[in-house]
Amino acid sequence: MSQNGDDMNKAMMVDGNAAGGMLYDVFSAEMTASPTECAHCGRHEQIGELLAFVHAPGIILRCPACENVLMRVVKTGEFTYVDARGAVYLRIAK
């Protein structure tokens, strides 16, 4: 991707709090304060501190340190797909 494309993508990212509503719908819990760990660089963050790309069919959450994709969430008419393979763990409160 070109430098201009990278800059535009970064300009469209917001903090992970923007994903809070969709994550609540998926997990039935407040997720923005939930801790996670990046599988690439090992950084520990709360979901609300991640970078969120919300201008897509779903959301993409990235590590603010290395920009590794920690989680993708896509809702379709029938299903919700969650891919969290970029996270070592995601802790969900009871």
Residue ranges of predicted features:
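Short linker/helix segments within small regulatory modules
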Residues: 51-60
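Short Cys/His-rich "knuckle" micro-motifs
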Residues: 45-52, 73-76
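Short Cys/His-rich Zn2+-coordinating modules
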Residues: 15-28, 43-49
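Short metal-binding segments enriched for Cys and/or His
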Residues: 67-81, 92-93
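Short cysteine-rich clusters marking metal-coordination/redox-active sites
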Residues: 38-41, 63-66
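Long C-terminal interaction/binding lobes of large macromolecular proteins
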Residues: 2-3
